[in-house]
Amino acid sequence: MKIWTEPFGTTKAGEKATKYFLENSDGTRAVLTDFGVTLLSLSFAGKDVVLGYDTIRDYEEQTEYFGATVGRFAGPIPYGKLQVGEKVYQLTQNGDFGNNMHGGFTGFS
């Protein structure tokens, strides 16, 4: 198994993103980034089967969630309010109608 990294660019917020490559002896290769744990590419016999973009900026501006890793939750949390026990947490409101969508402005997707 070969593992290596390459720079992927800089986000609008000035954070550096990295690509992580994993390749086995058969040539199957996965490419991920630390920007939202996004799957950039998955190749079998030299053919990429993942739909996505070429630049970090494209991933920042997308609305389709290509390559996104679902984490914490998927979908909306109404009005960005999450109750755990007796405590209510106000989350960022990044979706329609003030909902928190897919982890907020910065997250898995």
Q: Positions of the model-derived regions?
A:
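Surface-exposed acidic/polar loop and edge beta-strand patches at domain peripheries
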Residues: 1-109
